[in-house]
Each structure stands twice: as C-alpha cells, then as structure tokens.
A protein has these predicted regions:
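Bacterial N-terminal signal peptides
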Residues: 6-15
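Short, hydrophobic/aromatic-rich segments at coil-to-beta transitions
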Residues: 25-34, 60-65, 94-100, 198-208, ...
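Beta-strand elements of well-folded, non-transmembrane domains
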Residues: 35-39, 53-59, 70-74, 88-92, ...
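Hydrophobic/aromatic-rich structural module bridging two neighboring secondary-structure elements via a short loop
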Residues: 66-119
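Mature, soluble, non-transmembrane domains
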Residues: 100-260
Length: 260
C-alpha cells in the first residue's frame, strides 16, 4: 500500500521571486495525528488509529520517521490491523537518500523495502539500489526529487504564488511505480498564520505511474494544509477503495543540532 509520500515539488516553472527568497527549510518537529475513516465504503466501514511524523535536522542532512497505524472494521465483520513505518535520511544537498519501509498486517510483516538512492550533480539520471529486496536497482530520471526536497520545493513555489506544479518523485516506499511517481500538485490561496507554525496553503496532490506521464487515474491522492514550516493539518489520504483523514492532535518543536 502506498501510504504517505510527503508533499510535492517542482521541476520547472520557477518564479523569479522564489530564487531571491531564502529556500524553505522544514522546521524540526514531531507531530501526532488522530486517524479515522473519511466516509464509509465497501472496503471499510470504520477505522481508528494514528499517524505520527518526525523531522529531525542533522548536521549533514535531515532524517524523517513516519508511522501510520489503524484498526479497520470490515463490511462482513472482523477487523484489519494495519501498521506501516517509513524512515528516510536525505543529505543537505538533496542528492543522497537512505530509505526503509516495513508494513505489518495483523502483526505479520507483509512488505519491506530498504536501500539508498543518489542523484548526480550534473543533472543526469540517478540510481536507487535496494538491499531489501536484494539486488533490485532502479534508474531515476534526471532531476528526480526525494521526499524532503520535494516538500521544501513545494513550499518555495507556494510562497512564490505557483498554482499547479509537477515533479518526478522517488520515495523508496516500494519498487517500480510504487516508489517512482509523477506528482501533480494544485495549490490554493494562502491561509493566514494562526500560531508558530506560520501561514499555510491548502494542497491537493495526485500520484501517477511515471511511465504514464501522469495522465491516467492516479495511484494515490493526498491533500492537506501545509505550513511554511513544513507542518501539515487536515490530512486526507485517498487510496481509491477507501480514504483516511488525519487531524493534528499534538505538535512539538525539536531542537536543531549543534554543528561545527
């Protein structure tokens, strides 16, 4: 299951004012969301769980940890216990990434992916190499973005007034089209600051198999209100057969590292 590929970014159409502004940096933070079903479906009639996100700055990059878990009630009776954990580390220059994803269903591991990816400085194609499953390699198109860079680019473009943006994204949450997608993001008008999280923008992202050029039915859809600090509110994850909603319950700012 594709569960949470964080936010989108741009490959082209940069607005001149964005180049003059300081690039976005995600605020190191930890957030906990209450998770539930966004309407009864033929797949699930109820769901109860949580979604946790942590972004921790390091001297040479940024590490993220995400976990989504819920117990879903099935139409014919019975329950589904689902738990997925996803971690990444990305270098400060946005060119290197390590990733790990493991999902559980009813307490059993059903999927696991681990590896690393790299994009070259010359703007050419990159490569992802998996240790789980062993021996799997993927070619990444030129200018493919990793998740943290993807999110920061989207914030930059929202601040510059962009309304529709698109990008190739690699997140490591699978292999093939599960990990490498073409993302189109629609950005709404900014929401005034309410607290330390700052101003925010409503966003709707559609994830397509990259080979299809983003023209067919999306594999996955994601919407949220994203702040300039990288904090999400009002999250909706649409898998097609069912959709989940997540509301921010707790937020904690984390201290930055001391780097020489």
């Amino acid at each position: 299951m594709r569960w949470m590929v964080m936010a989108g970014g741009l490959l082209a159409g940069l607005v001149a004012s964005a180049a003059a502004a300081a690039p976005a940096q995600i605020m190191p933070h930890r957030a906990l969301y209450e998770l539930g079903l966004a309407g009864r479906t033929s797949t699930l009639v109820d769901a109860d769980g949580a979604f946790a996100v942590e972004w921790r700055a390091q001297c040479e990059g940024i590490a993220s940890r995400q976990r989504l878990w819920f117990v879903g009630s099935l139409p014919g009776g019975g329950e589904l216990d689902y738990d997925v954990r996803f971690t990444t580390w990305e270098s400060a220059d946005d060119r290197r990434m390590r990733f790990s994803m493991r999902s559980y269903q009813d307490g059993r591991v059903v999927e696991e992916f681990r590896g690393q990816a790299r994009m070259p400085e010359d703007g050419g194609p990159g490569r992802a190499t998996y240790t789980v499953p062993k021996g799997v390699e993927m070619r990444l198109p030129p200018e493919t973005l990793f998740p943290t860079a993807h999110m920061e680019r989207l914030i930059d473009e929202a601040a510059a007034g962009a309304a529709v943006v698109s990008a190739a994204l690699f997140d490591g949450a699978g292999v093939g089209s599960e990990a490498l997608t073409f993302v189109t993001a629609a950005i709404g008008d900014p929401v005034a600051p309410r607290d330390e999280i700052g101003r925010a923008w409503p966003m709707a992202l559609a994830y397509h198999a990259l080979a299809e050029g983003g023209t067919d039915t999306p594999l996955f859809e994601l919407s949220f209100e994203l702040s300039e600090a990288g904090v999400m509110r009002h999250v909706r994850l649409d898998y097609g057969a069912f959709a989940l909603k997540a509301e921010l319950e707790r937020f904690e700012r984390l201290s930055p590292p001391r780097c020489e």
